[in-house]
């Protein structure tokens, strides 16, 4: 597999020196229409180098439509491999940037620990700087930029919309954290039940038992800053999600309604923590509503 190929399976006979194609993953996809991701790097505002994958649409479009897609985790990385969600957007005429903002893995210790207690802060600035880099280099039109992500990427979507509303024309928050205070409280309760606490979340997210941790959670909870949102928002949520529980989306929608914001939402009753590798019906419904959303708000 590769960034432009979901996977081919071969039988290799070393004795005969032959290679035989057995089958293709997702054979209905035209490989010629899939786009290869390009590894790029850009500098953040404080001088940190940020690796990213840039995937450019093969479609001819009247504008440079653009989506920045922060990955989940956040303590993971943007792997070089086939990404059906990115390819979906690219096939619709949208360029996609997937940055390894600070706090991502695979880029050295300094890059990783620089993300400690930086949700919504320098981690978000790295994403914003990726957007500015794309605009400067002609991959994005400044008035045609959307942000989309799942899990931590959903949090980053919300942080982008509330802390840098001027950057984005729309946003897609899939299974994303919106309430940092509640997230940290939930993990504290789970830890006390198990009589243990993983030190890594304390370092990364903060400690709600301290004044500093409580202040950090308040500063970085998108739910508290819904007033700042000016772009239309799509919220996708699995009702049975055990990782980012549905109250994150439900409380967000209540605030969006109360503040008169433009939004759409889809809850999948039987799904958990997923957006592209859910059940077939749910995955297709998620993709259909996203296509309608970007046609309505990114392209019009």
What are these regions (language model features)?
Residues 4-11:
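Structural motif
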Residues 25-146, 150-151, 178, 185:
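Cap/lid segment of the alpha/beta-hydrolase catalytic domain
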